[in-house]
A protein has these predicted regions:
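Glycine-rich segments within core transmembrane alpha-helices of 12-TM secondary carriers
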Residues: 160-182, 392-402
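Juxtamembrane intracellular "pre-TM" segments in multi-pass secondary transporters
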Residues: 2-13, 219-259, 285, 456-459
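Short amphipathic helix-loop junctions that connect adjacent transmembrane helices
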Residues: 30-65, 273-294
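Cytoplasmic membrane-interface "Motif A"-like loop-to-helix N-cap segments
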Residues: 90-106, 318-332
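C-terminal transmembrane helical hairpin of 12-TM major facilitator-type secondary transporters
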Residues: 323-368
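C-terminal ends and interior cores of transmembrane alpha-helices
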Residues: 101-120, 331-347
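Helix-to-loop junctions at the C-terminal end of transmembrane segments
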Residues: 82-95, 308-322, 410
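Hydrophobic core of transmembrane alpha-helices in multi-pass small-molecule transporters
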Residues: 110, 121-139, 350-366
Length: 459
């Protein structure tokens, strides 16, 4: 039975936000901190043992530091094919919550299996990451699609920011525990590589464990529609997707925003995804190389500061408007990559790295939380999961163009500073496109479309 009329329920909103608390462990402990440097280290060892500068993945020579960025790109390429279909199925059926549960479980189990990464199994790290990241993105489609259902329009900026803030806090707490364990692991007789593997697996346990708070409090939404004769959920998913593509002309401003978001969020997600590899790589010029403890401490600081940053940007959006808030954040992001290219040198490099982290923390949560709530107002009722499937293609940890650009720039120039600077393209494109998005027209188009189709068949 549908419960669409119940909105702004504090218990349900808390349960919804707890999923951000749960799955952010994957983003921080796995995606941002430990997996990239660890897999790159295993791959470098394998390359050195073979007497080459690359490793072979299914016969393809790959630079060790480029391997995981390529895996990110491949996993998102898979999402481009799969997520829109899943979104269409979810909007047609009553399975939104169930599908969220299934993919969260698959992702968590793949993450737990990262404990097995030893010796020459660097390639398994890539395979498990692809499975986990694909599942992470699929579950987030259904999670985001709940936002218009659980929060009224005037509350969405606040609720979206609250979800992101909970994610930063949850991911930060586990990261703090993992950092403490990593620092003192040798003192208690645990080798460093084993400590990393335990930390990776802990993210999967955290993910699946705290997700039960979400399952207990999140209500099923949208009653199922009867399938037409001869149709299955898969076939109707393809047809709904085709219909969505044919109807995008009704939402030109929403599509303009989605294009801008696709570009600038690629930049944001790539900076986050490659930060650990960038800072820890021995080939960085100017003495930037950071040990794992310093690197993790900086990212931990970012996590906790981002909790307050996300809440601040929710307030800022109320003062100057959501679109203007995102534009301000993109200017700061552009400054971050410029400084990563030209700065971070000299005797104070560690202090500079912390200062750069402060600016990242300031904008990281705000640019994403406000983008999500803004997009939620631009889509018609009944098509939330379909539209959020397209949105998720460029969501956190699932960018594909950015990691590909970063990986290719590093492989071509052999310089990670040039690779990080190349990402400024995405922020510049966002700054160019966003001013042309008419937010009020987008909201009006979505409302009129929903009203015109409310008495008809599923839209």
């Amino acid at each position: 039975m549908a419960t669409e009329a119940i909105v702004n329920d504090r218990k349900e909103i808390f349960g919804w936000a707890m999923y951000d608390w749960a799955n952010s462990a994957f983003s921080t402990t796995v995606g941002t901190v430990f997996l990239g440097p660890y897999v790159a280290s295993l791959a470098r060892t394998a390359a050195e043992a073979a007497g080459t500068s690359t490793v072979s993945f299914f016969g393809i020579p790959v630079a060790p530091d480029s391997f995981l960025p390529y895996c990110i790109s491949f996993s998102v390429g898979m999402q481009v094919l799969v997520l829109p279909i899943l979104g269409a199925i979810a909007d047609y059926s009553h399975l939104r919550k169930r599908m969220m549960q299934i993919f969260a479980t698959i992702g968590a189990l793949a993450t737990i299996m990262m404990f097995l990464l030893t010796g020459g199994l660097w390639w398994l790290g890539g395979v498990l990451f692809i499975i986990a990241n694909l599942s992470f993105g699929a579950a987030i489609v259904f999670y985001n699609a709940y936002l218009p259902d659980i929060a009224s329009e005037e509350e969405r900026d606040r609720v979206s920011s609250y979800g992101w803030a909970m994610g930063y806090m949850g991911g930060g707490i586990l990261l703090a525990l993992n950092l403490a364990f990593f620092i003192f692991s040798e003192d208690i007789g645990v080798p460093g590589d084993l400590a990393v593997r335990i930390n990776l697996a802990s993210a999967g346990l955290w993910w699946i464990g705290f997700a039960f708070f979400t399952w207990a409090r999140l209500r099923p939404r949208h009653a199922a529609k009867a399938l037409p004769a001869g149709e299955t959920y898969v076939s109707i998913g393809f047809k709904q997707l085709k219909k969505t593509f044919s109807e995008v002309r009704h939402f030109p401003e929403t599509m303009k925003f989605l294009l801008a978001y696709f570009l600038y969020n690629d930049g944001i997600q790539t900076v986050i995804a490659v930060a650990a590899t960038f800072a820890a790589a021995p080939v960085i010029q100017g003495g930037l190389e950071q040990d794992q403890t310093t690197l993790t401490a900086v990212i931990l600081m970012i996590q906790f500061m981002a909790f307050f940053g996300a809440l601040f940007w929710g307030k800022l959006a109320g003062w100057i408007g959501a679109k203007q808030s995102v534009i301000v954040s993109l200017v700061i992001w552009a400054g971050v990559v410029i400084y990563a290219y030209g700065g971070l040198k000299g005797d104070s490099v560690t202090a500079q790295f912390f200062i750069l982290g402060v600016f990242i923390a300031l904008v990281m949560g705000g640019s994403q939380a406000i983008s999500r709530s803004l997009f939620a107002q631009m889509i018609p009722r009944g098509k939330e999961a379909e539209f959020f499937a397209f949105y998720e293609i460029s969501e956190r940890g699932t960018s594909w163009i950015g990691p590909l650009v970063f990986g290719l720039a590093n492989q071509i120039f052999g310089n990670l500073r040039i690779a990080i600077l190349a990402l400024i393209f995405f922020f510049i494109m966002g700054l160019i496109l966003l001013p042309f998005v008419n937010v009020q027209k987008a909201i009006g188009d979505a409302k009129r479309y929903g009203e015109n189709n409310s008495s008809g068949a599923q839209v």
